C-alpha cells in the first residue's frame, strides 16, 4: 500500500476503489405488469439511471457464448464478466458433441463403458431433466441413451431430477415423454426414479435435503411406487407440489449397487456437487450413509478438483482474466457475496480457479436458512452491505466486487410481493454503497448478470420462475478521485454492448491495460463520439 511519512508520524494513503455491484437477476423490461422491478420502490436506482451515464447490455444467447435465445445464468454471466470475452459455454460444447454423435469418442465415457461391459454392472444416468439449459439439457440425456446402446450397454437406469425453476413449474410431463421416446428409440433404458431439484440439487449444505435424494438412489429398502411416473406427477400437482419440490420417488428396483456406473450429466457444478460428494467421497461427513455403493462415476464437467470421478468434458483453461490483471499489477481486490452467489464472484468470475489470486480477499456472508427465499426476501443483503462498506472504507482495495442475490433467488420463487421487497432491499443497499464509495472518492459501476425478477408471470398465467433473455442495466457513477483523464464530465456509455465489455470497462476505470485476449470493449466513450460498430466478441 503506498505511504508517505512526515516527522515521527506515518500516513498511509487510502485507495479510492472501483466498486462493481452485480444485481443478480435484475433485468430490464419496459412493461410494468408482472415486473417486480418496475413496480417496486426503487428511488436510488431510478435517480442514478436518470442522473448518470447508463446503458443496456446483452446478457443472454450469443453475447455470453450460449445458443441464440438461450437465457443467461449466473455462472455464465460471472464467467463472461471476469473473462472480458465471449467464452464458448459448456452447453454449446456438449451439445455440439452430442449432435455430431461424438460422445463415444470421449475418453472418460469410453473407459466407463469398457469397465461396465466387463463387470456387467448397470449404467445409471442422473441429472436435471429439462431444456432449461442452465444446469443441463435433455438432449444430452437422449444422446447418452444412444451412446449407451451403441456401446453395448443394455442395463441402463435413468434417474430424472425434475426442474420447475428454469422451466415452467408444471412442465415435467413434457420432458418425461421425451425421455420415454428416447428410451424406445435407443432400445435401452428404464425409468428408475424421480426427484425434485429442491432435494437433489441443494448447494447450501442443507444436507437434510440431499440425503432424501441420496436414499432414493441407494437404499435397497426404499418402497417402489405402484403407479407410473406420469401418475406420480399428477398426484404431486393435485397436492400443490410443483416440479421443483417433487418428492423423491423410486419407480423400479434399479438403485445404485456395487460395481455399477454413473454418469451425472449436469454440466454446471454448483448444484451437482453435494450429491456427487455423498456418492463418491470416502470421508464424507454431511450425513450418515447407511448404504455406500462402490460406483464408477463420470461427471460431465469438473465439479471440484478432489472428487474421485472421471470428467467427460474437462474445462478449457483461461488466462488474462480481470482478477489476474488486477493481481499482476500489485493491486488488492475484495470479493463478497452471500452463500447463494459466493462461488460466482470467486470461482466462476476467476474462470474456474478455486484458490484466491495474490492480493484477492474473499468474504462469505451466510444466507438465511429458510425453505424458500420468499420467506426472507431481504436475505443477507444488509449484513453483506455492511461488510462491503467496511472493505471500501478500509482504503486498501482497488477493486471491490459485490453480488446481491435477492432479485434472482426471490425471483425464482415466483412470489410477486416478496420479489418487490427483495428489489427495494437491494435499492436501499445500493444507496449505502453509493455513499461509502463517494466518501472515498471512488467509482461505482452497477450491472447485472442476467434477467429474472422483471418477469414474474408467464403468458399462461402461471408463476414465471426462470431467467429471461432481457438486457441488463449498466450505470456508471464516477468518483472525484477516479475521474478519467481527457473526458471531463462528458462521458456516456455506448449502446450495443454485452457482459464481455464489463471487464474492459473496469480496467479503464482502474487505469490498467486491457490484455489482447480480452476481445470485449470498454463501454465508456465521450459524448457525441461515434459508437463502435456493434459487434459481439467471437467465442474462444
From Swiss-Prot:
InterPro entries: Alkaline_phosphatase_core_sf, BPG-indep_PGM_N, Metalloenzyme, PGAM_B_sf, Pgm_bpd_ind
MF terms (GO), sorted A to Z: manganese ion binding; phosphoglycerate mutase activity
Bridged cysteine pairs (disulfide): none
Signal sequence interval, chain numbering: none
Keywords: Glycolysis, Isomerase, Manganese, Metal-binding
Binding residues for Mn(2+) 1: 408, 412, 467
SUPFAM superfamilies registered for this protein in UniProt: 2,3-Bisphosphoglycerate-independent phosphoglycerate mutase, substrate-binding domain, Alkaline phosphatase-like
Residues involved in Mn(2+) 2 binding: 24, 74, 449-450
Keyword DNA repair attached: no
Keyword Manganese: yes
Biological process according to GO: glucose catabolic process; glycolytic process
Superkingdom of origin organism: Bacteria
Cofactor binding, per record: Binds 2 manganese ions per subunit.
Residues engaged in binding substrate: 135, 165-166, 197, 203, 268-271, 341
Enzyme class: isomerase
Catalysed reactions, as listed in the record: (2R)-2-phosphoglycerate = (2R)-3-phosphoglycerate
Gene Ontology CC: one annotated term: cytosol
HAMAP family xrefs: GpmI
Primary role: Catalyzes the interconversion of 2-phosphoglycerate and 3-phosphoglycerate.
Subunit structure: Monomer.
Protein name: 2,3-bisphosphoglycerate-independent phosphoglycerate mutase
Biological classification of the source: Bacteria, Bacillati, Cyanobacteriota, Cyanophyceae, Synechococcales
Gene for this chain: gpmI
Amino acid at each position: 500500500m503506498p505511504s508517505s511519512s512526515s516527522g515521527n508520524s506515518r500516513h498511509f494513503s487510502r485507495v479510492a476503489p472501483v466498486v462493481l455491484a452485480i444485481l443478480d437477476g435484475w433485468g430490464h423490461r419496459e412493461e410494468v405488469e408482472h415486473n417486480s422491478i418496475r413496480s417496486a420502490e426503487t428511488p436510488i436506482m431510478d435517480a442514478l439511471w436518470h442522473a448518470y451515464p447508463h446503458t443496456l447490455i446483452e446478457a443472454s444467447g450469443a453475447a455470453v457464448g450460449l445458443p441464440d435465445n438461450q437465457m443467461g445464468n449466473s455462472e455464465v454471466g460471472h464467467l463472461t464478466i471476469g473473462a472480458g470475452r465471449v467464452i464458448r459455454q459448456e452447453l454449446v460444447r456438449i451439445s455440439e458433441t452430442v449432435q455430431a454423435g461424438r460422445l463415444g469418442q470421449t475418453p472418460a465415457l469410453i473407459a466407463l463403458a469398457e469397465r461396465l461391459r466387463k463387470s456387467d454392472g448397470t449404467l445409471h444416468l442422473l441429472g436435471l431433466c429439462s431444456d432449461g439449459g442452465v444446469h443441463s439439457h435433455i438432449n444430452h440425456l437422449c444422446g447418452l441413451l444412444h451412446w449407451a446402446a451403441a456401446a453395448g450397454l443394455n442395463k441402463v437406469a435413468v434417474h430424472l431430477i425434475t426442474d420447475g425453476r428454469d422451466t415452467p413449474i408444471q412442465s415435467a410431463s413434457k420432458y418425461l415423454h421425451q425421455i420415454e421416446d428416447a428410451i424406445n428409440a435407443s432400445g435401452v433404458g428404464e425409468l428408475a426414479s424421480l426427484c425434485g431439484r429442491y432435494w437433489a440439487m441443494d448447494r447450501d449444505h442443507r444436507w437434510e435435503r440431499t440425503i432424501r435424494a441420496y436414499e432414493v438412489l441407494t437404499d435397497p429398502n426404499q418402497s417402489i411406487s405402484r403407479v407410473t411416473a406420469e401418475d406420480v406427477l399428477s398426484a404431486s400437482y393435485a397436492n400443490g407440489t410443483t416440479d421443483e419440490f417433487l418428492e423423491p420417488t423410486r419407480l423400479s428396483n434399479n438403485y445404485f449397487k456395487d460395481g455399477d456406473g454413473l454418469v451425472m450429466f449436469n454440466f454446471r457444478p454448483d448444484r451437482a456437487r453435494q450429491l456427487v460428494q455423498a456418492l463418491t467421497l470416502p470421508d464424507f461427513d454431511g450425513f450418515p450413509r447407511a448404504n455406500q455403493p462402490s460406483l464408477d462415476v463420470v461427471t460431465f464437467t469438473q465439479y471440484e478438483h478432489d472428487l474421485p470421478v472421471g470428467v467427460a468434458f474437462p474445462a478449457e483453461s483461461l488466462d488474462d482474466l480481470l482478477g489476474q490483471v488486477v493481481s499482476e499489477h500489485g493491486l488488492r481486490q475484495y470479493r463478497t457475496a452471500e452463500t447463494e452467489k459466493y462461488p460466482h464472484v470467486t470461482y466462476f468470475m476467476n474462470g474456474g480457479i478455486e484458490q484466491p489470486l495474490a492480493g484477492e480477499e474473499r468474504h462469505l456472508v451466510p444466507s438465511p436458512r429458510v425453505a424458500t427465499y420468499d420467506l426472507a426476501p431481504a436475505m443477507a443483503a444488509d449484513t453483506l452491505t455492511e461488510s462491503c462498506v467496511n472493505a471500501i472504507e478500509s482504503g486498501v482495495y482497488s477493486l471491490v466486487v459485490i453480488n446481491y442475490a435477492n432479485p434472482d433467488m426471490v425471483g425464482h420463487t415466483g412470489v410477486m410481493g416478496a420479489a418487490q421487497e427483495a428489489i427495494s432491499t437491494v435499492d436501499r443497499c445500493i444507496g449505502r454503497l453509493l455513499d461509502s464509495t463517494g466518501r472515498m472518492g471512488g467509482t461505482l459501476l452497477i450491472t447485472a448478470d442476467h434477467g429474472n425478477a422483471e418477469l414474474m408471470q408467464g403468458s399462461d398465467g402461471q408463476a414465471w420462475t426462470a431467467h429471461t433473455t432481457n438486457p441488463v442495466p449498466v450505470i456508471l457513477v464516477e468518483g472525484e478521485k477516479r475521474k478519467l483523464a481527457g473526458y471531463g464530465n462528458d462521458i456516456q456509455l455506448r449502446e450495443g454492448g454485452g457482459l464481455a465489455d464489463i471487464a474492459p470497462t473496469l480496467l479503464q476505470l482502474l487505469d490498467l491495460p486491457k490484455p489482447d485476449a480480452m476481445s470485449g470493449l470498454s463501454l465508456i466513450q465521450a459524448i457525441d463520439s461515434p459508437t463502435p460498430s456493434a459487434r459481439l466478441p467471437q467465442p474462444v
